[in-house]
């Protein structure tokens, strides 16, 4: 990415076809879709890219097996199609994972789940049906071909495996002596890194990207949205952006973008937030091995235990949330709920003190006025067009982010009378690199090469070149983890990281994996120093930024034993 300074200069000196408010997954894909169709695009993010819901997901690219319980067949089919496409477009960042549903003791086979898995298999391979929309036929031809190519990553339907194989795949099951298990496949990713990759592709097509840009007003001319005004957080300056189209892609904040005088209340969605909490655990405490496991969690609920970055990722909860959506952290009861489910199922005794990290996000569910609990509300995306012409896209799920972006840009193309087909079904999200192609004589931490290949793809070479130039940067950010100090420099120089938390929580994910080791200013002092070298911070500013990290970490609740004000 270009620097924030250069981005601001471009914004101030140009008019745009489109301004996108929100730098999460949906906003990133709107920007990429529009820019790749030839539009001039600026994307503005109030805080950091993916700082909201898009960095707090379950890290899964999946069809949503449980949505079949609500008969959301269309949503599941769409998500499964997009899942296959993401494996094609970002093979280094979206990867298949085996999922197990074990049968323990004398438990009978879950017949309903077996039926659901049969439907899941069928929906994953169903042909592509043409939808109406600008450029749709051409895209669906490409999409069908892409699905044909990528479905080979999971060539077999779900099957039943014996208990010994299940225990081999997930050692945590071994003490339980499983009789058998259903085995099926879904995909995992690093959610915030995938957003960064999409944003980099959008910039490659000409989009201008800026974080730390708080949109405070939607401008209008004769009752029509004509741009936005934002406050640049570093300087406090107010900047106006002229744009022919305005898209609100702020997710759970979508109903807060309500410009006075040019919209009716009924023209924007009413968000019903739902909080989802996750925890991470050491593999010594929960050895998940190579597989994910669906874990019963009471009252018909199920949670997941997944391998992720050398930890076991456990989640999620799904509860109505009426707190401050700008400050979402795991509740003590949610952490206890997840631990109770794990301990009950795996017959372990994992205590809160053993939790290596925790995080919570808020899903932007759209309220229908129904009294159903949030777990039963559909995750379908919705687009709203106001009398001002502003488009709002919200709801949905991470897996369908590409299609949500397409839905918005299709509408802009339609009303502008343009001829520009969607191309995002064929635009690679970064370039993959095999770990063996990145071999180096550098003395790197164990696992660093593999992690760099996953996180950056071909861009990992730039990290390694920096390590060769400055060998001290080949050291780990935190002892025992493969994340390199060079990544701090790359994040600051190339990815608009401007706070320690941007690096620790979103460019790397160390804050979610080793929260107890990163709970002091001293623990991130080297990160602050490296960022300061790039951003021109004084010694005093570097110390202040390290202290700000501690405050933010406590607000985020990444270490559930240490919270703000406690």
Report residues per predicted region.
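Extreme N-terminal leader/targeting segments of oxidoreductases
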Residues: 1-18, 33-37
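C-terminal accessory subdomains/tails of enzymes that are appended
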Residues: 7-10, 15, 47, 93, ...
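Short hydrophobic core segments
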Residues: 19-21, 241-251
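N-terminal Rossmann-fold NAD(P) dinucleotide-binding loop
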Residues: 27-28
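Glycine-rich FAD pyrophosphate-binding loop
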Residues: 35-55
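Dinucleotide-binding Rossmann-like beta1-alpha1 core, especially the glycine-rich loop
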Residues: 59-165
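Helical element adjacent to the flavin cofactor pocket in flavoenzyme catalytic cores
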Residues: 182-245
